[in-house]
């Protein structure tokens, strides 16, 4: 299986330098987590988009799949993960396969919360879960200026601190409400924003249910529009 993954990755990279794909790790139950890379790999402008971290909040996958299928962008380096919590998606639960809320397991202001399978159980320790460690490695590797996390179901874009400027722009491009809300303990955006000053990691809360096609396209537009603003402005 490992050889097949390697060969498929090499084939993608060889056939089209603007598209590649690789498995960056495995979930707690052994499912592959894959990242797709689109656009200009030589560009210093990096954007990361994650479609699903809570397994029962999967509407964002439609946006990430749309981005992957679209013509690769020019002028920036786009990294896309459809699902960082494949076990939770398979089980249709918020938590990962070990009953941990991955978005309370990051090592930024982490505190012990709840018990296994509680909605916001933060795990036995920060970074206890393979999925959060995979994200940590990837973010350290590519150091994206913008990271967008899709959630549900609040129908708004939320951010705090240094990420609020970029998040407001996304909200405008996507025609959504924006709210300044402090990050809970142990979240992915809070970790990145503290670990990499000057970057912008924020959350897009989609509506309940699946996204209609025109909204999928609108969110994909918001991603690329925000990235292009990044190309011409040091402060997004």
Model-found features: residue ranges?
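Hydrophobic alpha-helical targeting segments used for export or membrane insertion
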Residues: 3-12
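Short beta-strand-to-loop junctions in surface cap/lid or active-site-entrance loops
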Residues: 34-43
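His/Asp/Glu-rich mid-to-C-terminal helical/loop segments that flank catalytic regions of hydrolases
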Residues: 210-236
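N-terminal cap/lid segment of alpha/beta-hydrolase-fold proteins
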Residues: 16-32
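Active-site/substrate-binding loop(s) of hydrolase catalytic cores
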Residues: 27-28, 43-50, 57-181, 188, ...
């Amino acid at each position: 299986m490992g050889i097949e993954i390697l060969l498929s990755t090499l084939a993608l990279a060889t056939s089209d330098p603007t598209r590649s794909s690789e498995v960056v790790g495995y979930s707690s139950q052994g499912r592959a987590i894959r990242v797709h890379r689109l656009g200009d790999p030589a560009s210093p402008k990096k954007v990361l988009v994650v479609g699903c971290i809570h397994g029962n909040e999967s509407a964002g996958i439609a946006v990430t799949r749309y981005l992957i299928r679209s013509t690769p962008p020019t002028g920036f380096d786009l990294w896309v993960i459809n699902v960082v919590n494949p076990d939770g998606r398979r089980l249709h639960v918020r938590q990962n396969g070990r009953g941990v809320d991955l978005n309370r397991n990051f090592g930024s202001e982490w505190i012990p919360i709840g018990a296994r399978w509680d909605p916001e159980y933060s795990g036995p320790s920060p970074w206890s879960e393979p999925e959060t460690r995979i994200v940590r490695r990837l973010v350290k590797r590519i150091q994206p200026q913008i990271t967008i996390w899709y959630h549900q179901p609040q129908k708004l874009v939320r951010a705090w601190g240094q990420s609020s400027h970029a998040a407001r722009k996304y909200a405008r491009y996507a025609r959504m409400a924006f709210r300044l809300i402090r990050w809970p303990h142990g979240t992915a955006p809070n970790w990145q924003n503290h670990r990499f000053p000057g970057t912008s990691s924020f959350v897009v809360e989609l509506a309940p249910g699946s996204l209609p096609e025109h909204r999928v396209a609108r969110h994909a537009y918001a991603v690329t529009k925000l990235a292009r603003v990044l190309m011409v402005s040091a402060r997004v």
